[in-house]
């Protein structure tokens, strides 16, 4: 009786981009601290509506190399990058987020920007 709703074809889905980044700081941070810092930075610079449109989402974060991947909407990549560059501290500790690059797939992002940090 309860039928599953039809999924959207790939041509109608939102296009995504993946951003590789590295946290530069004297301290080590965990995934939750980075997620909160990214979210707060986007809310501060883009506002609630802009953040909702950009859809920033932390996909993966490696705590040993302090590198990670963020997914966002294709049309708002530079808005998210702008927000990340304005991060100056995380939980009261001085830190900056350096964007390594942008790609359309996670596989290509790892191969191109994160392979030097041991990502496979």
Curated annotation (Swiss-Prot):
Keywords: Cytoplasm, Endonuclease, Hydrolase, Nuclease, tRNA processing. Its EC number is 3.1.26.5. One of its GO terms (molecular function) is ribonuclease P activity. GO terms for biological process: tRNA 5'-leader removal. Pfam families: RNase_P_Rpp14. The keyword Transmembrane does not apply. Its main location: cytoplasm. It is found in: Cytoplasm. It comes from the Archaea. GO terms for cellular component: cytoplasm; ribonuclease P complex. It is an enzyme of class 3 (hydrolase). It catalyses: Endonucleolytic cleavage of RNA, removing 5'-extranucleotides from tRNA precursor. Part of ribonuclease P, a protein complex that generates mature tRNA molecules by cleaving their 5'-ends. The RNA is catalytic, but its KM for pre-tRNA is 170-fold decreased in the presence of the 4 known protein subunits (Rnp1-4). The protein subunits also decrease the amount of Mg(2+) needed for activity. NCBIfam families: PRK03717.1. PANTHER family: RIBONUCLEASE P PROTEIN SUBUNIT P14, RIBONUCLEASE P_MRP PROTEIN SUBUNIT POP5. Consists of a catalytic RNA component and at least 4-5 protein subunits. Forms a subcomplex with Rnp3 which stimulates the catalytic RNA. Belongs to the eukaryotic/archaeal RNase P protein component 2 family. This is Ribonuclease P protein component 2. The lineage of its organism: Archaea, Methanobacteriati, Methanobacteriota, Thermococci, Thermococcales.
């Amino acid at each position: 009786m309860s039928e599953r709703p039809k999924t959207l074809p790939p041509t109608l889905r939102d296009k995504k981009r993946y951003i590789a980044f590295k946290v530069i700081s004297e301290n080590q941070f965990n995934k939750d601290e980075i997620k909160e810092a990214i979210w707060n930075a986007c809310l501060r610079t883009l506002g609630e509506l802009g953040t909702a449109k950009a859809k920033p989402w932390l996909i993966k974060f490696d705590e040993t190399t302090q590198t990670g991947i963020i997914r966002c909407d294709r049309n708002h990549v530079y808005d998210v990058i702008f927000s990340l560059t304005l991060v100056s501290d995380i939980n009261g500790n001085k830190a900056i987020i350096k964007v390594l690059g942008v790609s359309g797939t996670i596989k290509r992002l790892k191969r191109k920007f994160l392979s030097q940090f041991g990502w496979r």
